[in-house]
């Protein structure tokens, strides 16, 4: 029986991932955790939740022992934009939290660890179009640096200790449920909210900025598909490229204008433009498709329909 701990279960991805995992493995078998951010009512009401700091090894170990955990999914991270404001915090949370996770999993002989990576691992020297699975990794942010180190650490634990460690390089993730927390691609979520609330949006990157993106249902699907894949089919482990769609801000705005004709957008690029410019336009995810059958379901138009519909429901209820 799987006993899964989701670290960072109050975050943008973790808050939705945990609910899907509970529907698959049973509410009591999927434990959520967070440091201080209050999780959603749905997370609290459907299963166990513990507050602790993953940087504190003893606290993480105690929760793993208490619930007899055999799989850890560590979603806790300081993201790219926030990490540039406080790089030492990003290093501490992202690296020490990961090391604690890997060491405890090794000591307790756990079944699996899943730790996501990011397109932030890419940087100058990476091909901008269809960034390959194997390519130059020279990130320009502390977040990206920790993710490169995390990929290498995960692969090291596979080779050195036989621990099953898996990871995938998330593109920008878009969702109408939990707001993102300080990433460079946050504009792709904020634009939908502002379109519904104010019919206008000021974007912090330029209109021709093009980045790989993914809708949350595909993000959850990719994570669980990789988690459930047969280990023997995996040639890669901690660093899978996963793609779904790629679009510029102008194309995103046009997609919204088709549905809200009065919507307008303006541009005031800030420090996040440099980060976005260091990332590729798209990724080559052939390895994920071959090794564990990755296949996304949503494109830009389908996502825009769903985002606007669900955010309008929130707005009409006075929730935003």
Please place each PLM-identified region on the residue numbering.
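Conserved beta-loop-beta element that borders a ligand/cofactor-binding pocket
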Residues: 117-118, 151-177
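C-terminal substrate-binding subdomain of Rossmann-fold SDR/epimerase-dehydratase oxidoreductases
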Residues: 204-206, 211-320
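N-terminal Rossmann NAD(P)H-binding glycine-rich loop of SDR-like oxidoreductase domains
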Residues: 4-24
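Conserved Rossmann-fold NAD(P)-dependent oxidoreductase catalytic core, especially the SDR/UDP-sugar
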Residues: 74, 99-142
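Glycine/proline-rich active-site loop of Rossmann-fold NAD(P)-dependent oxidoreductases
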Residues: 148, 161, 173-189, 216-217, ...
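A conserved pocket-lining segment of Rossmann-fold NAD(P)-dependent short-chain dehydrogenase/reductase
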Residues: 171-180, 190-214
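Flexible, glycine-rich beta-alpha linker
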Residues: 123, 138-142, 166-186
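NAD(P)H-binding glycine-rich loop region in Rossmannoid oxidoreductase-like domains
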Residues: 54-93
